[in-house]
Each structure stands twice: as structure tokens, then as C-alpha cells.
């Protein structure tokens, strides 16, 4: 989605070990692992002006060692190339999940809130480590304008935990809990990245989305019928369903169905000039009818 917008006005070069068969004709795609030496050749020959890092591996089915190597080791190599070839802009797509859902969270979390989302979930531990590496890079290399974006739940055609969960016909909920949820349309995230690429933009920004809604109301909007289950049983049910490939929603995500993890988007609005274009109903509907 980002490439299809940027290539209209910019020269776009992609690096990914996966194929990109339907890329726009004017987009250059290098099918290489960022950790390989060939990546240095790309930076040397392409005169890179900005790097947008989207390559976080979230798949909880991937082994911890492989996931860590891809998420952390690859990102460290990327930072080395940015320094070596004096790239002037770095945009990192993190997540509001780094804050973690907790019973004592304030209603809205600011960018300086502690990153407490790693409890019992290796994929989030990696994301927090990556976020902190980007923060360290921001301070150590002021010549590169570094932007870290922390969006709330991204909804659309994307295959992430939130969208996968809301696409379930009979999603499990935790009995007695109905947390308020924030969501942002995947195309609004693309727009936020475009804002972050503007000269002068730097720092950490929460991406709040168009508003909040109780989880139960989201289900009503989608016409789905959740199955309320006691907390301890819900963990067991989801763990087994995930293990036997009956569900793509991992049990450690259950805390998002109990507690709030909502962010304050004031800084993105006032500094980046970003406001969502899609309202909350459009954002929720994008789970089943994503926009091109």
C-alpha cells in the first residue's frame, strides 16, 4: 500500500527476501535478506535518501531464535548501513502494543509511557527491543531524522492479530470484560508514514485513529457473535486452537480483550499534522471490505 502511493512522486526501492510479483513497473525490488552483504551494494548504488522500516516479523508460529534474528539482527544491520551511507531519514513502524494492556493503565498513554507490553509474549519483546534500538539511534545519530510511529490496532486487509481476530466467525471474549478499543485504518497508517517522511519530522508519535469503541459494539457493527469464556478457560481454549491451527489469534493477546491500551494522538496531530481520513465505522468495516 505504501509503495503504491509513494512511487507516484518518488523513486522507490524495496529490499525484502520475499517476492513482490505485482509491484508497480517503476519500483525496483531487491529480493535479498537485509542481513546479507548484497544489501550494502544496494545502499552504495541507489543513493538512498530515506529508509522506511516495515520488516517486523510478528508471526507467533515462528521460532524465537529465527524471529529475533530477523527482527533485531536485521534491524541492527540496517542501522549500520544508514550510518555508513549517511541516510538522512529513518521511519520505523512500531506499535502501541509496546505499552501493553494493563488494568492500571491511564485512559490514554503518551509517548513517554513505559514500554511494558512484553510480559509472556516473545514477539512483543522483539518489538520493544527494536523500538528502543530506534530510540537510541535517534539520540546517537542526530544527523538522521528518525521517526518512530506507534499506531493503535491497524485494521484492513492486513493479516495482523487484530484484523485476524475480528474476522473470526465466533471470536472468543473474556467473560466480564468489555474493554474500549482504538483502531486505525491501514491506509491512514500509510498517510502517517508520508507525513513522517517530510523534512524536519523526527521523534516518537502515537497514531490514535478516529476514536474509541467498546469491543462488544465492534462485534455488533461486524455482525459477529462472540463466545464469552471465563479467563482461565479462554487461555486454554485459544492456546489449543492456535496450536492445532484452528485459530490465528495467539493466547498471549488475550490481555487486549481484558484491559485497555489506548494512546494519546495529540503529538502526531500537532507536530506531524496527521489526522485520520477514515472514520471509526469505515475503519472497522475495512476488516471485511478493505479499500484498494
Question: Predicted regions span which residues?
Answer:
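NAD(P)H-binding glycine-rich loop region in Rossmannoid oxidoreductase-like domains
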Residues: 32-73, 81-84, 101
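Conserved Rossmann-fold NAD(P)-dependent oxidoreductase catalytic core, especially the SDR/UDP-sugar
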Residues: 77-123
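N-terminal Rossmann/SDR dinucleotide-binding element
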Residues: 1-50
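Catalytic helix-loop patch of NAD(P)-dependent Rossmann-fold dehydrogenases
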Residues: 104-148, 153, 173-175
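Amphipathic terminal alpha-helices
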Residues: 270, 278-292
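Substrate-positioning beta->alpha
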Residues: 126-129, 160-163, 174-197, 203
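Mid/C-terminal beta-alpha module of Rossmann-like enzyme folds, strongest
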Residues: 190-251, 265, 281, 285
